[in-house]
Amino acid sequence: MALTRLLIKDFRNIEAADLALVPGFNFLVGANGSGKTSVLEAIYTLGHGRAFRSIQAGRVIRHDQPEFVLHGRIDGTETERSVGLSKNRQGDSKVRIDGSDGHKVAELAQLLPIQLITPEGFTLLNGGPKFRRAFLDWGCFHNEPGFFAAWSNMKRLLRQRNAALRQVSHYGQLRAWDQELVPLAERISEWRAQYSAAIANDIATTCTQFLPEFSLSFSFQRGWDKESEYAELLERQFERDRMLGYTALGPHKADFRIRASGVAVEDMLSRGQLKLLMCALRLAQGEFLTRQNGLRCLYLIDDFASELDSTRRRLLAERLKATHAQVFVSAVSAEQIEDMVGEKGKMFRVEQGKITVQSQD
């Protein structure tokens, strides 16, 4: 699977661009602020319905324009698909797939699985549990057909339950919500646990290649006491939840922890080592998807050289090459990506939102 063509209109500082892409490495080289990250963000937005640097649509639409428009052509193993997304300043989205309107953003995500590696990506390791839940949920979304519907319903029921907690006086008034919430919560927790167990070997293998000096362990925490039934816990915790005004325990509090020799990795590893670990997690997840479903991820790597010395850059370059996936890499200079440049690569020069093809000679 590869994105063979990308059209960008009024996205960030890019007025218009029509890019012919290659299945291997696509390099975006330019000074800071030139727009190279905007290209990566456009691809990410086409696959997720939102940008990774801002959740507000108005901030990614070019100045004085009413909307942004993105189109892509995806070359799969047997078919070619066309996808499109537009979003106005009010946040209203239109999704088009193969020429027809009325599709959902989740359908884009299914067609265009993306792994993102940015300088801010350390939050996967040292940020709050929501970032690691998102990591697990990405995997469940692509491996369990019913996950997205169950996850969406669970989020809706939790919002309704939290609103009701501020109004009710006894648990019986919440029972109807919990009768729907509990089976969804248990199913989602089971899917997450199964996925974290299934991918653990992939993560361990990749981490051994990247960080052989550490003995890493992984553990999934479902968000409530593993000895307790969730239905009983919700009833038992009612008074506490009512005082708090929200549901304190459940799958929305799940986490996936990584330790090095028993110590949280964020407390032991250097920033360069944390970046390698983050890359290892993303690569392992992408390779697991390929093995399970035959789909290859797109890898988006912003500011490739950040936090990595030349030895670590070469290591990451070799591992990315081994995936045979499509990779998009941004860098300030061509020298920073010389270990990746090869006959299957294509280089783009980005200057003030203008994108041109640059010879690699």
Swiss-Prot record:
ATP binds at G30, A31, N32, G33, S34, G35, K36, T37. The keyword DNA repair applies. Its main location: cytoplasm. It comes from the Bacteria. Keywords: ATP-binding, Cytoplasm, DNA damage, DNA repair, DNA replication, DNA-binding, Nucleotide-binding, SOS response. GO terms for cellular component: cytoplasm. Pfam families: SMC_N (PF02463). GO terms for biological process: DNA replication; DNA synthesis involved in DNA repair; double-strand break repair; SOS response. InterPro entries: DNA-binding_RecF, DNA-binding_RecF_CS, P-loop_NTPase, RecF/RecN/SMC_N, RecF_2. The keyword Hydrolase does not apply. One of its GO terms (molecular function) is ATP binding. It is found in: Cytoplasm. Belongs to the RecF family. The RecF protein is involved in DNA metabolism; it is required for DNA replication and normal SOS inducibility. RecF binds preferentially to single-stranded, linear DNA. It also seems to bind ATP. This is DNA replication and repair protein RecF. The lineage of its organism: Bacteria, Pseudomonadati, Pseudomonadota, Gammaproteobacteria, Enterobacterales.
